[in-house]
Amino acid sequence: MAGENHQWQGSILYNMLMSAKQTRAAPEAPETRLVDQCWGCSCGDEPGVGREGLLGGRNVALLYRCCFCGKDHPRQGSILYSMLTSAKQTYAAPKAPEATLGPCWGCSCGSDPGVGRTGLPGGRPVALLYRCCFCGENHPRQGSILYSLLTSSKQTHVAPAAPEARPGGAWWDRSYFAQKPGGKEALPGGRATALLYRCCFCGEDHPQQGSTLYCMPTSTNQAQAAPEERPRAPWWDTSSGALRPVALKSPQVVCEAASAGLLKTLRFVKYLPCFQVLPLDQQLVLVRNCWASLLMLELAQDRLQFETVEVSEPSMLQKILTTRRRETGGNEPLPVPTLQPHLAPPAEARKVPSASQVQAIKCFLSKCWSLNISTKEYAYLKGTVLFNPDVPGLQCVKYIQGLQWGTQQILSEHTRMTHQGPHDRFIELNSTLFLLRFINANVIAELFFRPIIGTVSMDDMMLEMLCTKI
């Protein structure tokens, strides 16, 4: 009977008997499938009927044999198919809600027309809500009563977040709305002024300066805020006392170490083969331009540490007496005074370095020590500083430019062989040379060499050291 083709096959009675047979049959073990449920193939679309009827004089079966799973499925468009698909959508597990970035506070459409109350401008009613261009939802218009209530409740019930470090106070301390006067909310030009405005920096709403809402939270914060310790001003801030004169705490030890470092620096430069082929005048041009930077690299390599003390500035009476003594004594130089912690040296004899200038030297030394620069890396950095093609008065520019480029190439190859991150190490080493721009050569001369050489200029001393054997 199962293999025969009966004439009532496809009728309602045949389908009911076949369904009862499949229901009372012993359930078979479900096979493991790659897909949870099969929803038929394209055979269910032919013929496309919405109701069970007679298409072309022939009965249309409610079920069809699937080409994928081999089972019977209801035809698409039939009543049975619609019932099954609607039941599937009803009992399907709800999807997890997507994570939203935060509440949307509308677009610029809420400002047109800018009204403070809901009224009839121009004889047309203004809707309290508008459709947002970003999220597609309805938001209250800015300046309306509903908008003010929502923004006020948002600021009241939201948990206070930790304040971020800002360079100049809170966002509402900006002068963006300071040009709008008025301590009370009024109607300038017949229009009501909104209590809040949209900030251009953070995109949030803040109360206007001068309004009652602005004065209330600011006064509360000022009354209840705990006194915090103000951060120290940086060394380049002239208003924090960074221009106060300082001197070495142990001048004899530090000056001797600096003199030894200068001798080693000039010995390193003088006996370079590529430097010896230059004329004496070109050698002098290069050394006079970069001796201070080369000395700083040498002091960093020797790990020279020094301390300074503050000295008092000379009074007007001391300046007058010093000038009169020099006029009466002729051109005889003043004796070098013994540097004591709080004894002011004569202002005409030398300019005492300031605390900010000395701090720039210490910052450079600390930067070099933090990188643990090797001896070869110090030598390549010295070569980069020495062969500077931008020095004024230099004639062999192409030759010096080639030497600097070759030194940088050797340094790059060395860092690639000794470190895994070649570009990071190479950039860090060259970044130390940028700090040398904040160090003045006259400050180094006054701090380390003036107590020893007196009134002799550093240029004359460089010429003497280049001409003599050291």
Curated annotation (Swiss-Prot):
GO terms for biological process: adrenal gland development; gonad development; male gonad development; negative regulation of DNA-templated transcription; negative regulation of intracellular steroid hormone receptor signaling pathway; negative regulation of steroid biosynthetic process; negative regulation of transcription by RNA polymerase II; protein localization. Gene3D superfamilies: Retinoid X Receptor. Nuclear receptor that lacks a DNA-binding domain and acts as a corepressor that inhibits the transcriptional activity of other nuclear receptors through heterodimeric interactions. Component of a cascade required for the development of the hypothalamic-pituitary-adrenal-gonadal axis. May also have a role in the development of the embryo and in the maintenance of embryonic stem cell pluripotency. GO terms for cellular component: cytoplasm; membrane; nucleoplasm; nucleus; ribosome. It is found in: Nucleus; Cytoplasm. This is Nuclear receptor subfamily 0 group B member 1. Belongs to the nuclear hormone receptor family. NR0 subfamily. Homodimerization involved an interaction between amino and carboxy termini involving LXXLL motifs and steroid binding domain (AF-2 motif). Heterodimerizes with NR5A1 and NROB2 through its N-terminal LXXLL motifs. A motif (LXXLL motif 3) lies at residues 146-150. It comes from the Eukaryota. Residues 1-253 are annotated as: 4 X 67 AA tandem repeats. Residues 205-469 form the NR LBD domain. Keywords: Cytoplasm, Nucleus, Receptor, Repeat, Repressor, Transcription, Transcription regulation. InterPro entries: NHR-like_dom_sf, NR0B1/2, Nucl_hrmn_rcpt_lig-bd, Nuclear_hrmn_rcpt, Nuclear_receptor_repeat. The keyword Metal-binding does not apply. A motif (AF-2 motif) lies at residues 461-466. Homodimer. Interacts with NR5A1, NR5A2, NR0B2 and with COPS2. Interacts with ESRRB; represses ESRRB activity at the GATA6 promoter. A motif (LXXLL motif 2) lies at residues 80-84.
